[in-house]
Each structure stands twice: as C-alpha cells, then as structure tokens.
C-alpha cells in the first residue's frame, strides 16, 4: 500500500510540472468524479455493447476539466484495466477498452462508441 501511495504521489508531482497545484488537484478531483459518474451510468444502463461508450465518455468528460482531469482519467483507466487483467479478463477486451479510453481522453467524440438504442438519458 505504501508503494502504491508513493507511486501515485510521484505520478501526481510529475504530472503537475509548472501547473498550479490547487488547480491541478481540483481538475483531478472533478475528473475522478466524471469517471465515477460514467461508471455509475454504465452499471445503471446495463446495456449490451455500451461499455466502450461509457469508457470513452468518462475519459472525455474528465479530460475536458484540464490536465488534472486527463491525469486522473489515465490513472483510473490504467488501474482498472490492470485489475481486470489480473482477474483474468481477456487481453483483447482490455485493449479495446484502452482504445476507447484514449479516444475519449484525446477529446474525440465518445458518441463514436454509442450503441444504437441506448436511452438518451446517457
């Protein structure tokens, strides 16, 4: 746990560079909330073939917050995919999820992954 905390702190320090700390931390917090909201919506929707859309949407929304949001989205996405791989989920699906994550983080429209019939609420 100490190692993970240390790596997270180092990643934060390196990610900030000359950014103002409070701005970066605020963006990261809001970005993490955006990721949580997309995950919650995915669970609520429980819609077949919609996971890539929610991955892209969460990363997109977080990245719109600024560099802190991009950092939070990358850390959360990478940690989630690493955990999925450790639990034995397929590497192909993980790679597809990461592609959707990167798509959203780069500012591209997450609706590219939106499945037909997904309620407008999402």
From Swiss-Prot:
GO molecular function list: heparin binding
Pfam families given for it? SAA
State where composition is biased (Basic and acidic residues).
105-122
InterPro entries recorded for this chain? Serum_amyloid_A (IPR000096), Synovial_Prolif_Regulator (IPR052464)
What tissue specificity does the UniProt entry give? Detected in liver.
- Which residues lie within the region annotated Disordered? 87-122
**Can the keyword Transmembrane be found in this entry's annotation?**
no
The induction annotation reads: Up-regulated by inflammatory stimuli.
What PANTHER family is this protein classified in?
Answer: SERUM AMYLOID A (PTHR23424), SERUM AMYLOID A PROTEIN (PTHR23424:SF29)
Reported function? Major acute phase protein.
Q: What family does the Swiss-Prot or TrEMBL record give for this protein?
A: Belongs to the SAA family.
Name recorded for this polypeptide: Serum amyloid A-1 protein
